[in-house]
Amino acid sequence: MRIVRSLLAVAIGSIVILVFYDAFLQFLTQPYRNICSVNPEFKCDGTLFALGPIEGLSARMRIAGYGGLIFAIPVIMWQLWKFLVPALNKQEKKYSIPFIITSVVLFLAGGSLAYWTLDKALEFLITWSGAGVEQTYQISKYISLVAMMVLAFGVGFLVPVLIVFLQLVGVITPQTLIRQWRYSLMGTFLLSAGITPSGDPVSMLALAVPMSMLFFVAVLIGFIAQRKKAKRNPEGE
């Protein structure tokens, strides 16, 4: 039933995207048009092209699908948390609302950062494609790149939430995380490089740096939660 609710939320989000498709398409292609307009040496006019009569429809459905998934993230996170709740104790269950709100806010923050980074990433990629190379982008591939960037950044920003959760349920301690912080940061940069679809250093750093900062915030929250738990149960020290 939880899967059905999540799929229904995706479907509703997709319908909303289809109704306002032109506005969303303009929004998604704005970064590409921006770099073309301010960099005439890039030899592009901001126009996307379709290879065949079906590709335009395919791009429309991709935008609807990806957009529906992004819009449904709050519902999906809530359903996932409700699935985990039975395995939690009473003390852990009280974190439900803060976890959901934080997860949604961080996902949206990550997605927004991806969109803001997109023109910088495209500028880097176009520059490194070489002088005199005319830039003409296929609409379906461009839309997939934008969508995967947003999803990658959004999911990347959720990793600290997972770290906090694992500390609260006792799977890992903040002391262990802080001792291994160098490996954690290395893992953060490797993860950023792995999930960034464009593969450019601009996007990788734009994701890795805030993820690293959020890692330390997550560890700090773990220490605070550990101290509060020790005060509630002094005999457990």
Regions found by a protein language model. Give the residues of each.
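Membrane topogenic/interface segments and analogous intrinsically disordered interaction regions
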Residues: M1-E237
